[in-house]
A protein has these predicted regions:
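Trp/Phe/Arg-rich N-terminal binding region typifying the photolyase-homology
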Residues: 1-88, 189-192, 197-259
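A charged, amphipathic alpha-helical module
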Residues: 67, 71, 75-203
């Protein structure tokens, strides 16, 4: 996978020297062995934190495994930060991130209604900004944008609408081709976009780490995660229904190399 390869190259050439640590999940076939490459290559330079999510995540033993993994990550992050991460810290973070998820879910709905204003490149830029901004500031600005979009009349789009699906689709030059051909993005099933904020973490759980594990367990229709009913084509039907319900005329699937 070129994404994972580029990450390792940027770590090795010093591009990411400002980082104090890196978390390496094992959610796909590339990351499982490559997590050890990260550890061997960067272990003397920064903290390399191994994270193995459970695939059997629905049962109590799966939840407990996930909790144990998150607590290992928490301990490593405490070592980096030089202080304890309290339950209150995690509870506060859950609230902050849930508000951000809600704002982004509202944005993608409004983007479909106002695709004359929110072009594919602008839609991607707004969602991608989440990864680079402090979350309260990002959410506040996005709520302002959502409020302005809600004031506009719903667009009578004369072009084509599609749903995008895949791991990532944020290349501005590629997205500009959509615009040149009068194609709008009605909705997405992209891991880097909507799939990352589809499910909230419970705010009423006494143990906040368990709340995070429950959030992971509640993620569904995810190609990277185990589905005990995959023989029923649940994910395929889910994406097909997304196309129908969003008013799109088709689906564009972005495949990563070797993914």
């Amino acid at each position: 996978c070129t994404i994972a390869q580029l990450d390792l190259e940027m770590l090795l050439d010093g591009t990411m020297d400002l980082l104090d640590g890196v978390i390496t999940p094992t959610i796909c076939d590339t990351l499982r062995p490559m997590s050890q490459n990260f550890r061997v290559a960067m272990g003397d330079k920064m903290k390399v934190i191994f994270l193995a999510h459970p695939q059997n995540r629905f049962e109590e033993f799966g939840l407990q495994f996930c909790i144990d993994q998150y607590n290992h990550v928490k301990a490593d992050l405490e070592e980096i930060a030089g202080r304890k991460i309290t339950d209150s810290d995690i509870q506060d973070a859950i609230v902050v991130y849930n508000k951000s998820r809600a704002a982004r879910r509202e944005f993608v709905k409004l983007a479909n209604e106002h695709c004359d204003v929110i072009t594919p490149t602008k839609r991607s830029a707004v969602l991608k900004a989440f990864y680079f901004m402090e979350k309260p500031e990002y959410t506040a600005k996005l709520n302002e944008l959502n409020a302005e979009l809600a004031k506009l009349p719903v667009c009578d789009w004369k072009g084509t609408k599609v749903v995008t699906s895949g791991i990532i689709c944020d290349n501005p030059k590629l997205l500009s081709i959509f615009e040149e051909n009068n194609i709008a993005i009605a909705a997405d099933d992209v891991a880097h976009e909507t799939r990352s904020f589809r499910v909230d973490a419970p705010e009423d759980e006494l143990d906040p780490v368990r709340a995070l594990a429950k959030q992971f367990a509640n993620i569904d229709y995810e190609v990277l995660l185990y589905d005990p009913e995959s023989n029923k084509n649940r994910r395929g039907e889910f994406v097909a229904n997304m196309v129908k319900e969003s008013g799109a005329q088709g689906l564009v699937l972005f495949m990563q190399q070797f993914c």
